[in-house]
Design a protein with these regions (language model features):
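Acidic/histidine-rich alpha-helical segments that form the ligand environment
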Residues: 93-142
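Short, contiguous alpha-helical
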Residues: 1-25, 29-37, 41-44, 49-90, ...
Length: 158
């Protein structure tokens, strides 16, 4: 049985993370629809600040987006080896946004996604914790992508 190298494993984690955030123009996908707005970057562009601020099934899209931004920033730090305690309650403190805040969250998500991707490349194989953090952030982001997609679907039903 052929074994996968750690570099290949990190590359695959990055590929799944890419699909979570950007449109990957392949004839196939790992888990998202194969269209430009399937990942976070494109999907969040399809709604405005007012829509993002609506409470849908207990939380807003803005809440999830802020949590994603916060989580990405912390994941990059974790993968790089800084395991200082974090106040995760802070990651849910935003529930509504204005246009400027919504633009900033989306820009920060894009930058933080790249920071996580870079941290995976530079430190993802440096320790069990780093690799676990890399795998964990992929799963975490896939969950929130699905949650936001469901909230948008519910919002558009009404």
């Amino acid at each position: 049985m052929e074994q996968v190298s750690i570099d290949t494993a990190i590359g695959q984690l990055q590929a799944v993370l890419d699909e979570c955030f950007i449109h990957v123009n392949n004839s196939w996908t790992y888990f998202t629809d194969n269209k430009p707005d399937a990942g976070f970057i494109g999907l969040l562009q399809t709604i405005n600040a007012e829509e993002a601020s609506q409470n849908i099934a207990g939380t807003s899209i803005a809440s999830h987006a802020h949590h994603v931004r916060f989580s990405l920033a912390e994941a990059a730090v974790w993968i790089r080896g800084d395991h200082a305690p974090v106040d995760w309650k802070e990651s849910w403190r935003i529930s509504s946004v204005n246009d400027t805040e919504w633009t900033k969250i989306r820009e920060d998500i894009s930058k933080s996604y790249q920071a996580v991707r870079d941290a995976m490349a530079s430190h993802g194989s440096s320790s069990v914790e780093a690799f676990g953090g890399a795998a964990g952030v992929v799963a975490h982001m896939a969950f929130h992508l699905g949650a936001i997609r469901q909230k948008i679907a519910l919002m558009r039903q009404t």
